[in-house]
Amino acid sequence: MGIRYPKARVVALKNRILNRKKLWALVHVNSDIMVRTLALISGFAWFAQQGAQLGDETLAANHLLLQFITLSAFFLDGYANVAEMRAGQAYGAVDKQRFQTEVRRTTVLAAITAALLGVGIYASGSYTIPWLSQDHHVQQLAIQHLPYAALYIVVSFAAFQLDGIFIGATQSRAMRNATVLALAVLIALGTWWSALYGNRGLWVALVVYITIRAVVLSCYYPIL
């Protein structure tokens, strides 16, 4: 004997599942996130390709430093995920005070963590890099550019946090625009500065790239 549901309940459930407005909103959010992800991947792929043009040893040294950045991202992305969930819930409930509280709490923790990670990696990098490569020239290049990687980590928390906040608030278009603009700036400045200053110029462009993402999203923040 099958389970019977009232027709009105079935219709209500169908309308909730097949709500075109909400479905299109979901499609738009996911498409924006996809573009943002492609822009992120493209940025780091371009950074690696540009480093390769400066020589195999430079490419290897940059790859070592990117491991520190990747490691830090696991920590900072955790705070961004918490901000996405908790600030997103407050935003959906139209609770402005709670929204600001959640943003402030998670951002302060992320900033402290980023500072500790940056200082820790800068202080320990000269000891850990030799474990990652046996090539002395690669080691020296990596240690020489270690301050730029540490600086990137320190300033990157803002972009991570704002990404999480905007995703939670389903304001993904701003996040997409910020990442695409930052990618264009990275390619333009990276091409210019790497030609003038070599790998130092390339790293400075990467730091500017992550900063631009945060600055642009900060300009969008008042719409939340």
Specify the residue positions occupied by each region the protein language model found:
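Short runs within selected transmembrane alpha-helices of multi-pass transporters and secretion channels
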Residues: 1, 77-80, 149-168, 174-186, ...
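Short alpha-helical transmembrane segments in multi-pass integral membrane proteins
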Residues: 1-31, 87-152, 192-224
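Hydrophobic faces of transmembrane alpha-helices in multi-pass small-molecule transporters and flippases
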Residues: 15-46, 71, 75, 79, ...
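Transmembrane alpha-helix boundary and packing residues in multipass membrane permease domains
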Residues: 33, 37, 45, 49, ...
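Helix-terminus/linker motif at the lipid-water interface of multi-pass membrane proteins
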Residues: 38-71, 89-90, 127-136
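Short loop-to-helix capping motifs
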Residues: 55, 135, 171-172, 198
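Small-residue-rich hydrophobic transmembrane alpha-helices
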Residues: 61-123, 158-170, 174
